[in-house]
Amino acid sequence: MKHIVKQIHFVGIGGAGMSGIAEVLVNLGYEVSGSDLSRNAVTDRLEALGARIAIGHDAANIAGANAVVVSTAVRSDNPEVLAARHQGVPIVQRAVMLAELMRLKQGIAIAGTHGKTTTTSLVASVLAAGGLDPTFVIGGRLISAGANARLGTGDFIVAEADESDASFLNLYPVIEVITNIDADHMDTYGHDFARLKQAFIEFTQRLPFYGSAVVCVDDPNVRQIIPFISKPVVRYGLSPDAQVRAEDIDARDGRMHFTVIREGRAPLAVVLNLPGLHNVQNALAAIAIATDLGVSDDAIQQALAEFNGVGRRFQRYGEVPSADGGQYTLIDDYGHHPVEMAATVAAARGAFPGRRLVLAFQPHRYTRTRDCFDDFVNVLSTVDALVLTEVYAAGEAAITTANGDALSRALRAVGRVDPVFVASVDDVPDALAGVARNGDVVITMGAGSIGGVPAKIVQHIQQKA
């Protein structure tokens, strides 16, 4: 007998990965409930759409649920998980629920260590401009849509594929993107980089024979796995052997201008409303998919020129008064791995040439700080001024040799930047007020609670006005 599902409960519904799936299910007509430790804009939006939201985790919250959705971040002793197990309610992993949504449509899954959210957003935006009206589930808020998910009427669903817990192996899309492969979340793979690369190969094996793997050939680790991909491959990037390639790249006024070369097609002049070479690569993935699906060149050009970005991905907050009577440019970014951070710093240098770059950085996870310690020191040493916070633990036990103080000491030993260390992220606005000067570019960066700092700075200014 088929198990009838009417109500679906999400444990940790306010998270980026969970909320998007929940929103799509609400729009499909399911009764959706969920719990989280605190309210945020995402839970408020879901509640307005009709979801039932509880603050705090309690067994009573799953009342009436026919399925309970969890992510790998949810502990097995969570009271709602225990209640579901006791009551015989199916417990479904987030990626499995995403896979079920993909079964309803043709899936386009975006994978890679870095750039998933921006690339997913670019693909969704270009397909929408081409009239394909895709469903999308994104790990950040697509600013033009005001949400991180949307139920479209078209045949495609565009979603991020998460390698951090190997859950992307639950997905069976028809098109896959691999942006890059880097050493992150290595606990999942037993600290064996070969196992991580093998997981990406296995990911491509989920494609049907008529599917395609769209891969960034600029990344050496992606290039290494191409011979082991048994499905059709489309190579994109800046490399000469890329089938979808960018040439004549020019950074101007915070935008990237370039020409796209595609096999059998006329060159396409593109203006991308994002800075940085890494975003040129991300846009090429979207162009490759859009071209394959028959989106017109005019629609591709329009979507990229008008792209408004994603929340916390080089998100601009405008000009902010500085303590010396001038003003500085405030930007917020989700970067938390040295490779991502280096790309964002390079993008900022290209978008704002000659201006002093101030970074406020909150490291994310002690294990990542430990594993990438020297790389963090190197990238943080490339900015002109630095405010550094204690590590955002994300549930991990503290590691004294990889905390904020240890990172500060290592940076001072190198001697290229003298960090201002603050123990709490709440102290970042005051620290920035003492560092930022007229004409500076200030970036708040990290995957933890520092994401709330720019809004606090802007709110403080509005209250003083």
Curated annotation (Swiss-Prot):
Q: Which reaction does it catalyse?
A: UDP-N-acetyl-alpha-D-muramate + L-alanine + ATP = UDP-N-acetyl-alpha-D-muramoyl-L-alanine + ADP + phosphate + H(+)
Instruction: Look up the EC number in the record and give it.
Output: 6.3.2.8
Q: Where in the cell is it found?
A: Cytoplasm
Q: Which domain of life is it from?
A: Bacteria
Identify the InterPro entries for this entry. Mur-like_cat_sf, Mur_ligase_C, Mur_ligase_C_dom_sf, Mur_ligase_cen, Mur_ligase_N, MurCDEF_pg_biosynth, UDP-N-AcMur_Ala_ligase_MurC
Q: Name any Gene Ontology BP term.
A: cell wall organization
One GO molecular function term of this record is:
ATP binding
Q: Which PANTHER family match?
A: UDP-N-ACETYLMURAMATE--L-ALANINE LIGASE (PTHR43445:SF3), UDP-N-ACETYLMURAMATE--L-ALANINE LIGASE-RELATED (PTHR43445)
**Which protein is depicted?**
UDP-N-acetylmuramate--L-alanine ligase
Which organism was this protein described from?
Burkholderia ambifaria (strain ATCC BAA-244 / DSM 16087 / CCUG 44356 / LMG 19182 / AMMD)
